[in-house]
Amino acid sequence: MSSSVSSTSAPTKIVIPDLVSHCTIPVRCNRHWKQASVESKRWLFRGGNLSDRKRDAFHGLKAGYLTSMCYPLAGYPQLRVSCDFMNYLFHLDNISDEMNDRGTHGTAVSVLDALYQPHMHPTSRVGKMTKDYWVRLIQTASPGAQQRFIETFDMFFQAVTQQAMDRANGVIPDLESYIAIRRDTSGCKPCWALIEYANNLDLPWEIMDHPIIRGLGEAANDLVTWSNDIFSYNVEQSKGDTHNMIVVVQNQQGLDLQSAVNFVGDLCKQSIDRFHYLRENLPSWGPELDREVEIYVDGLADWITGSLKWSFESERYFGKAGLEVKKTRVVALLPRRA
């Protein structure tokens, strides 16, 4: 179902919800983060052929800092691969925003070919970068983690292609459809496979497919993704981008902007509460597997709290005003680009 957002008197600011206070999970950070961050950016700049302006943006992005809070116990080799993937994922997000569905599909083919056939020699830049981190990752990742990474990354590209088609056709999906596709466009699911890789876990499918484990991953994905929709709304609205839950809620429920922000904020808080509830109701698979499950679930929790902290310290959403926004929760809206 598609329609346009009803026009109202244009607001000049929004007040974002206080998600940081609602999240009581402690922040942890990997001790190797500075070295991994520097070397990973160097890897991206060399492989991605970025302009000076885009390089500056990646310095302000601080993807290595995010990665180090999300994988705090990883050894240096695993952290470095995870940093490379995170920088690369943001790079893919940036280039996919500039593409139509055909361009997105071409990128997907290059990436997935490199993952499914690592013995081949890719010719595109993105294919070469994919192969480079993938051959390092598969040295120690369990077969299950490798398969989950590839399958969920494939789902990511299917969803991003659908998003590009919706953007081209001016389609704003209903909330239920948006939630389903956003869980894949977020890129969180392959990052959950990296939790297994970064911590040298070998979890069987019957555990990873358990409703509570899947529910924990979904709750973490929802918090990371929906809070991101709040934090990125200002930049996105200035570009006319409608792939955002705030826009979807305004469109479907006829809410004004601040009410829509509050609505999404309440959903974010509910996702944190859902995560804690499921975590307290984990079944047991025996002492050895329970320890691996605990490490995996801790990794999901690290993503929740790490992403919230990073969002205000990165320059991606609030420029250099992130810490001020964190304190006041007031975001002055950017003018729409012509």
Swiss-Prot record:
Positions with a binding annotation for Mg(2+) 2: D93
Q: Which GO terms describe its molecular function?
A: alpha-copaene synthase activity; metal ion binding; terpene synthase activity
Q: Name one Pfam family in it.
A: Terpene_syn_C_2
**Gene3D superfamilies membership:** Farnesyl Diphosphate Synthase
**Highest rank taxon of the organism:** Eukaryota
Where is the motif named NSE/DTE motif mapped on this chain?
A: 228-236
Signal peptide location = none
SUPFAM superfamilies in the cross-refs? Terpenoid synthases (SSF48576)
Question: What are its GO biological-process terms?
Answer: isoprenoid biosynthetic process
InterPro entries per the UniProt record, alphabetical: Isoprenoid_synthase_dom_sf, Terpene_cyclase-like_2
* Keywords in alphabetical order: Lyase, Magnesium, Metal-binding
| Record's function text | Terpene cyclase that catalyzes the cyclization of farnesyl diphosphate (FPP) to various sesquiterpenes, including alpha-copaene, beta-copaene, beta-elemene, alpha-muurolene, gamma-muurolene and delta-cadinene.
| Protein name (Swiss-Prot/TrEMBL) | Sesquiterpene synthase 2
According to its UniProt entry, this protein's organism is Postia placenta (strain ATCC 44394 / Madison 698-R) (Brown rot fungus)
The beginning of the lineage is:
Eukaryota, Fungi, Dikarya, Basidiomycota, Agaricomycotina
